[in-house]
Regions:
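Active-site beta-alpha turn of Rossmann-fold NAD(P)-dependent dehydrogenases/reductases
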Residues: 7
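Active-site/binding-pocket entry motifs
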Residues: 12, 101-102
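Active-site-adjacent alpha-helix immediately C-terminal to a catalytic or transition-state-stabilizing loop
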Residues: 12-13, 59, 68-70, 127-137
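Short amphipathic alpha-helical segments with coiled-coil-like heptad repeat character
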Residues: 39-40, 102-104, 129-131
Length: 137
């Protein structure tokens, strides 16, 4: 089995340097163009199935790549981005400069209240692989 991983296209928050996390932000014009470019690069890949996060930026990217293919695109909550809780919408530079930055020292990152730890992210991602992808082999 081959697995292709594609990151969603750009959003206004990416452009502004704001931390998105699980906030449901759509693609901007550049993001839609990036999705179209990814679709063009992957047009010869014979996908049998596709999965994405239910977040609109991921859905629009995946829908563009899937295009007219006669395959199922399934959203799964376990593919959502890390939940940064109260930090979502914050300037990423402020988070990077902080003492508890998930970007500079992920191993010692302690999520703020209402946010998700990397262990939780890995657990739900691993659960997706175990329950959804491995049975496809």
């Amino acid at each position: 089995m081959k697995i292709y991983l594609v990151r969603h296209g750009e959003t206004d928050w990416n452009q502004a340097g704001r931390l998105q996390g699980q906030t449901d932000i759509d693609l901007d014009a550049q993001g839609f163009a990036q999705a179209a470019e990814a679709a063009e690069r992957l047009k010869e890949v014979p996908f049998e199935i596709a999965f994405c996060s239910p977040l609109i930026r991921a859905r629009h990217t995946a829908e563009t790549i899937v295009g007219e293919r006669k395959i199922t695109l399934t959203t799964d909550e376990r593919l959502r981005e890390l939940n940064f809780g109260p930090w979502e919408g914050t300037d990423v530079r402020k988070i990077r400069e902080g003492a508890n930055s998930p970007f500079t020292d992920p191993g010692s990152y302690l999520p703020p209240e209402g946010a998700e730890s990397f262990a939780q992210l890995y657990a739900r991602g691993g659960e997706f692989v175990k329950r959804v992808l491995l049975p496809l082999e």
